[in-house]
């Protein structure tokens, strides 16, 4: 059920924090997305990047009518199914929406309306860097016990997700947001919850090319810019499409800022962008599908080089112009660094399948069982975007 709080503002010496509920109607019922404002800030380790400036889902997304019981994680949309018009909801104390692939997670997030989208890789990095800067990296459900607990802080527990546990008695996911405040990104009541463990979460706009694209295996593909505003961001929902054209009249892009980059449309198809106006992309060839889209670029950097999948993060790519904004591992080993929670980094450069699923797409945070490898910096580039699985979920964000 919706949290009784509709609006709360808390101010301290570090930042202004706002919680707000945004209504959305589905099936004749009004549901409330509980969101947290992430203020803008800079980090001393990352020169030239301003993080924050968006609304983040306080909770991992659920289906609107989710409940804590058998089938309570899929009352509106079946496992693996197209969500249709069903919106994902950020609401307290229910099971996460699981068994949903990346393409459908983008759609379910955007079903809330203008400005709503799947959390981006940059927005996730903002949460990670804020918590690291303020000494509040979140604890979470990563021990796989009942009640759900943190492996380093076993006295910290949450409520068991009975829908997940009914699927397999050895799965101990938690109801979203039911852990202590230390499981929030700021260790306070007004924070973003469950960023450490519980569910791997799809991130918009961070992919890795595979051996399917000769000479490009391991290349990071990232968002076309770091703008988080409704008018400037490199993602959204088209207002019209035609041969070699996608238009989004809500935008005010800089002319040709995306030339030579790629459009990934609602079907996952990738198109080369020849040019753009303030509101339209002109493509080299083809007709894009209408709906959700993202604009990305190939950085040319092999983020698997010199790394071993499953190691722990030692340092981040803070000096890489294309990658420093995404809280990504630069080096790793079997021990890791406490500065980044000894969180893990996984990847797979093997051919993932046929296009558009011949890439790997980022999930972050870890699930209920990786132990110390889970955390807000944990990054897994091992899943193709069409994968559906029990520990894969997602989170909403909203642009202004």
Predicted regions and their residues:
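Short aromatic-cysteine micro-motif
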Residues: 41-195
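Short coil/loop residues immediately preceding or within conserved phosphate-binding loops
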Residues: 187, 268, 391
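N-terminal module-boundary/linker segments of secreted carbohydrate-active enzymes
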Residues: 1-48
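C-terminal, surface-exposed recognition/capping segments
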Residues: 1-2, 156-162, 170-172, 195, ...
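Short secondary-structure boundary/capping segments
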Residues: 132-137, 207, 216-219
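Autoprocessing Asn-cyclization modules and mimics
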Residues: 230-297
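Cytochrome P450 core scaffold surrounding the K-helix E-X-X-R motif
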Residues: 66-67, 204-217
């Amino acid at each position: 059920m919706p949290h009784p709080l509709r609006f709360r503002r808390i101010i301290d010496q570090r930042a202004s924090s706002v919680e707000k509920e945004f209504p959305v109607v589905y099936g004749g019922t009004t549901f409330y997305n509980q969101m947290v404002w992430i203020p803008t800030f800079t980090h001393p380790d990352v020169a030239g990047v301003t993080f924050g400036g968006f609304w983040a889902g306080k909770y991992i997304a659920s289906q609107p009518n989710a409940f804590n019981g058998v089938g309570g994680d899929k009352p509106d949309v079946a496992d693996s199914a197209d969500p249709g018009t069903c919106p994902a909801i950020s609401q307290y104390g229910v099971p996460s929406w699981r068994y949903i692939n990346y393409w459908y997670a983008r759609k379910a997030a955007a079903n809330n309306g203008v400005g709503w989208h799947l959390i981006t890789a940059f927005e996730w990095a903002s949460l990670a860097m804020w918590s690291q800067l303020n000494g509040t990296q979140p604890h979470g459900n990563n021990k796989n016990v009942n009640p759900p607990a943190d492996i380093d802080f076993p006295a910290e527990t949450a409520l068991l997700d009975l829908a997940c546990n009914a699927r397999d008695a050895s799965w101990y996911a938690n109801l979203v947001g039911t852990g202590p405040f230390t499981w929030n990104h700021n260790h306070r009541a007004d924070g973003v919850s469950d960023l450490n463990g519980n569910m791997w979460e799809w991130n918009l706009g961070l992919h890795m090319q595979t051996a399917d694209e000769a000479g490009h295996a391991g290349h990071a593909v990232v968002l076309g810019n770091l703008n988080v505003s409704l008018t400037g961001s490199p993602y959204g929902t088209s207002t019209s499409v035609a041969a070699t054209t996608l238009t989004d009249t809500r935008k005010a892009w800089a002319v040709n800022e995306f030339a030579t980059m790629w459009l990934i449309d609602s079907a996952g198809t990738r198109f080369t962008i020849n040019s753009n106006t303030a509101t339209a992309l002109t493509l080299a060839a083809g007709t894009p599908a209408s709906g959700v889209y993202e604009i990305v670029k190939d950085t040319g950097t092999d983020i698997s080089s010199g790394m071993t999948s499953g190691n722990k993060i030692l340092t981040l790519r803070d000096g890489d112009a294309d990658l420093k904004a995404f809280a990504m591992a630069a080096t790793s080993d079997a021990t890791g660094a406490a500065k980044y929670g000894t969180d893990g980094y996984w990847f797979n450069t093997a051919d993932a399948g046929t296009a558009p699923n011949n890439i790997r797409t980022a999930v972050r945070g870890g699930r209920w069982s990786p132990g110390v490898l889970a955390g807000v910096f944990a990054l897994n580039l091992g899943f193709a975007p069409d994968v559906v699985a029990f520990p894969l979920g997602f989170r909403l964000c909203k642009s202004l």
